[in-house]
């Protein structure tokens, strides 16, 4: 299923209204880092900015993404990330489109 939602919008089916969202990601299993970075690269055109903070005392990394994308793309990205082992993700949306 990977990229199914992404391809729908990238291949220009129809213009969609975009939303600004912040996606918070907690990585507790570094073995998932390569796949996580691959997913983020795939959705790169929607990512406004990224901040990563390694927190060594707890052995986790916190990543915050700012995105501007259709809601289906944001949901797809968040879902793909959240299905990785040792990774959780949540999105918070702006009130306005």
For the regions a protein language model found, what residue spans apply to each?
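Long, contiguous binding/interaction regions
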Residues: 8-97
């Amino acid at each position: 299923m990977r990229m199914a939602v992404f391809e729908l919008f990238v291949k220009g089916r129809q213009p969609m209204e975009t939303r600004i969202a912040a996606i918070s990601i907690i990585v507790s299993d570094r073995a998932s880092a390569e796949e996580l970075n691959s997913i983020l690269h795939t959705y790169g055109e929607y990512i406004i900015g990224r901040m990563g903070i390694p927190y060594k005392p707890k052995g986790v990394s916190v990543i915050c993404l700012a995105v501007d994308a259709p809601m289906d793309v944001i949901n797809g990205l968040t879902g793909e990330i959240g299905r990785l082992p040792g990774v959780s993700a949540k999105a918070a949306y702006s009130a306005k489109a």
